Amino acid sequence: MASQGTKRSYEQMETGGERQNATEIRASVGRMVGGIGRFYVQMCTELKLNDYEGRLIQNSITIERMVLSAFDERRNKYLEEHPSAGKDPKKTGGPIYKRRDGKWMRELILYDKDEIRRIWRQANNGEDAPAGLTHLMIWHSNLNDATYQRTRALVRTGMDPRMCSLMQGSTLPRRSGAAGAAVKGVGTMVMELIRMIKRGINDRNFWRGENGRRTRIAYERMCNILKGKFQTAAQRAMMDQVRESRNPGNAEIEDLIFLARSALILRGSVAHKSCLPACVYGLAVASGYDFEREGYSLVGIDPFRLLQNSQVFSLIRPNENPAHKSQLVWMACHSAAFEDLRVSSFIRGAKVVPRGQLSTRGVQIASNENMETMDSSTLELRSRYWAIKTRSGGNTNQQRASAGQISVQPTFSVQRNLPFERATIMAAFTGNTEGRTSDMRTEIIRMMENARPEDVSFQGRGVFELSDEKATNPIVPSFDMSNEGSYFFGDNAEEYDN
């Protein structure tokens, strides 16, 4: 782990920068989102989208996906070497929705990737601006986190579907860099490592030769990223064991699953950032806002303020509830899929309900869905208060590892207890404490047994009025301590499958 002196904030990771002071960070993050906004405005001109169509979140997602696809070097190379029927490796596109005679029409567009790259670079002072691309990836990832359950993926790797609160960022592409690694949950990292180990078990050449050497480096790097998320010495020591294993196999998979379970109570530090759809930045740029001059932060008041003044629309299917669609997007914008619903509801100023009670499907519309019956409505993305985002995991100081309900990875730095079903979690830890990691396992189990669901996390931290931009008067909410609020609890959400 880098020593404290060289640790970069996640804005620095986000913008690929070295250590900067707060003003420089705000400026470089501002430059990044401003570039996204300028690109979006230009794309709306290219595609002849009117104001309303440009504010449609489905159009925003198509445009975002086009630029991500245009810059996906590895996939572009693969497509050129493996020409498949009907896929032009040099082109990218997707559905654009336009309003015609009071109805929504779907129009499939196709663009040259190099043309898209040209527009993107032009909007970003001639640079590739990989930070902006990563930012868009994280927004898509946060949207997936709020929309889908990863039960099937968890079960496939031998994990328990109730560990879904550890799965933040599970759909992020590998190329998402340091900013992407910062927002990945413990479960996501464990799952990536298990997949890798399984390949090594099934394919004996996986760790061999020149390629195997690169694979090994990637494996150790992922282990280090995961180790850096853990906050207790025993968990980190177990990660060292996994990383140093000569020939990773089932013992390592066991250790990793054990660690993932332990993270339900001894939570890892996972970053949270508000990444908004490109059209939101586009709206601000079009109205003359200068992000770079004003500065911007992904973890403070700025995204809340931006959403207070942005009107974004969404297509709505016939039996969907627009308020529920709004909740889904609000959660995605604030990276709050795994936050306690009591906290989210308080900040939003409207009840945030569990996924299973939402009458809405995902935001994206499949190509075979009937447009005749599609309507559109305004997304309500405003909030009553704002709060600072956290990456601490909310562990209380006395044990640096506190109570965490099956299913909370706190997003906001707001005082509350983190209720959890100790019986449910501890049941998973019966027996197996032998083998080379026995002392660490025993130590981890002891810490978990000492964690109390009523312990208060984020002591003294509160939410702020939207007029309080300097965060001077924290309002500390009081929550019903017994009532837990988990979003995917008892759920029937759709699966995310690529």
From Swiss-Prot:
Late in virus-infected cells, may be cleaved from a 56-kDa protein to a 53-kDa protein by a cellular caspase. This cleavage might be a marker for the onset of apoptosis in infected cells or have a specific function in virus host interaction. GO terms for biological process: symbiont entry into host cell; viral penetration into host nucleus. GO terms for cellular component: helical viral capsid; host cell; host cell nucleus; ribonucleoprotein complex; viral nucleocapsid. It is found in: Virion; Host nucleus. The keyword RNA-binding applies. Keywords: Capsid protein, Helical capsid protein, Host nucleus, Host-virus interaction, Ribonucleoprotein, RNA-binding, Viral nucleoprotein, Viral penetration into host nucleus, Virion, Virus entry into host cell. A motif (Bipartite nuclear localization signal) lies at residues 198-216. Pfam families: Flu_NP. InterPro entries: Flu_NP (IPR002141). Signal peptide: none annotated. Disulfide bonds: none annotated. SUPFAM superfamilies: flu NP-like. One of its GO terms (molecular function) is structural molecule activity. A motif (Unconventional nuclear localization signal) lies at residues 1-18. Residues 1-21 are annotated as: Disordered. It comes from the Viruses. Belongs to the influenza viruses nucleoprotein family. Homomultimerizes to form the nucleocapsid. May bind host exportin-1/XPO1. Binds to viral genomic RNA. Protein-RNA contacts are mediated by a combination of electrostatic interactions between positively charged residues and the phosphate backbone and planar interactions between aromatic side chains and bases. Encapsidates the negative strand viral RNA, protecting it from nucleases. The encapsidated genomic RNA is termed the ribonucleoprotein (RNP) and serves as template for transcription and replication. The RNP needs to be localized in the host nucleus to start an infectious cycle, but is too large to diffuse through the nuclear pore complex. NP comprises at least 2 nuclear localization signals that are responsible for the active RNP import into the nucleus through cellular importin alpha/beta pathway. This is Nucleoprotein. The gene is NP.
